[in-house]
Design a protein with these regions (language model features):
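Short, glycine-biased loop/turn motifs at secondary-structure junctions and
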Residues: 1-142
């Protein structure tokens, strides 16, 4: 894992990664924390980074427990606080709790977001991703 992190760091530095990414991170948790930060997501979306081959290296490390779904096929999510869909992932997402739901799509992922009651869903997607938004009651999707 350390070698993979070093490779990602080298590539990210060439693209102008923020100084929060030091290349000394040692665990999947360290990388997830940086990736899920607002600056991390912004950097990855802006630079279409990392590529799918690199994302796939993290799939065996159980990143789904962090709300990151890489080539996960078709799935249904209920009230996720955060869901990051990557690659060949197609999700139907139901948001009904009175809280903020953050949904991020990268590398061609697809989502149908259904928000109702007083839910607030924030959706960010890269070019090439597909999002269908449905709201009812007082819910909003931004």
């Amino acid at each position: 894992m350390k070698e993979v992190i070093r490779q990602i760091y080298t590539q990210a530095k060439l693209l102008g990664a923020c100084p929060l990414f030091k290349g000394t991170e040692q665990t999947v948790e360290d990388i997830v924390r940086l990736f899920e930060s607002p600056r991390g997501i912004e950097f990855c979306m802006k630079n279409h980074f990392p590529n799918m081959a690199t994302f796939r290296l993290f799939k065996p490390h159980g990143v789904e427990k962090y709300g990151i779904y890489i080539d996960a096929g078709t799935l249904t999510l209920k009230d996720p606080s955060r869901a990051i869909l990557i690659g060949r992932t197609s999700a139907t997402i139901f948001c009904s709790k009175t809280e903020r739901h953050e949904i991020i799509l990268l590398h061609g992922a697809k989502a149908i977001v259904n928000a109702n009651k007083w839910a607030v869903a924030r959706v960010q997607s890269e070019q090439g991703c597909s999002v269908i938004k449905n709201t009812s009651d007082n819910a909003i999707i931004i």
